[in-house]
Amino acid sequence: KSEADIILLDVEDSVLPASNKQIARDTIKKNIESGLFKDYDVFVRINDRESGFLLQDVTQLCIDGIDGFLFSKTNTEEDIFFFDKLLEVIEYERGFEIGKFKIIPILETAASVINADSIAKASSRNVAIGFGSEDFVSDLEGIRDFEEAQSLFMPRAWVAMVARTNKLIP
């Protein structure tokens, strides 16, 4: 038995080539339905709005046993507002309680870090905020120096402060 806070499953960047994404979704559904993770909160990192996979991810993975989603590449509060409403429609159509599925926005660009406070406030479904350092450094066209990571101190601290002031988990 694990002492993990949550189980995080992934259908985003770690699933390549893209033709494997359906296999990943099917595997997640099979493992959830088998009860493998029944004692845990389960979140799935899904593909972003512009990927072409978001709708498939959400419609197939809004099932009992999934508690929420990591919403990749969140840039603005509109991204979260859109995703919140998408979840609401699915919950309504499937007879789930509205608000069942939680959101963890992942901030991976300079714009998203600047917009962190409005993103945090965009939905009552938000339970935490994540910071994606690899994509953040790419967005800045920076040098990856994760050993010292001095260039990441400010955005990490900012995201943590925004999370705490909005009563979210950093």
Regions found by a protein language model. Name each.
Residues 1-170:
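Expand to "…catalyze enediolate/carbanion chemistry for C-C bond making/breaking, isomerization
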